[in-house]
From Swiss-Prot:
Keywords: Amidation, Carbohydrate metabolism, Cleavage on pair of basic residues, Disulfide bond, Gamma-carboxyglutamic acid, Glucose metabolism, Hormone, Hydroxylation, Secreted, Signal, Toxin
Protein's name in the database: Con-Ins G1b
InterPro entries per record: Insulin-like, Insulin-like_sf, Insulin_CS, Insulin_family
Positions where 4-carboxyglutamate occurs in the chain: 41, 98, 109
Length: 115
């Protein structure tokens, strides 16, 4: 192989490096760039962004506290009725998975789901 071939190969490599370094900075992410979070990324983001915030679904829905927080005991029949009734609670379908997994969301939008 001739020296002109090596020179051409080095010139192309250098050109690719310069193009990558100059155009690659356009797609960098900042801290609050919207991104998709699915699966374990939702849990990790929740632990990072919602540190020490309580998430109580009963308070958000305006319903009573869970059975384990009440003072008295319920009969088995009443406990079963409450448990089965909680299964049919209406859902609005706009949870964190629908919002941040199916389309990208920023950290500020994700924090709205913190307790």
């Amino acid at each position: 192989m001739t020296t002109s071939f090596y020179f051409l190969l080095m010139a192309l490599g250098l050109l690719l490096y310069v193009c990558q370094s100059s155009f690659g900075n356009q797609h960098t992410r900042t801290f609050d760039t919207p991104k998709h979070r699915c699966g374990s990324e939702i849990t990790n983001s929740y632990m990072d962004l919602c540190y020490r915030k309580r998430n109580d679904a009963g308070e958000k829905r305006g319903r009573a506290s869970p059975l384990w927080q009440r003072r008295g005991f319920l009969s088995k029949l009443k406990a079963r009725a409450k448990r089965n009734g909680a299964f049919h609670l209406p859902r609005d379908g706009r949870g964190v998975v629908e919002h941040c997994c199916h389309r990208p969301c920023s950290n500020a939008e994700f924090r709205k789901y913190c307790g």
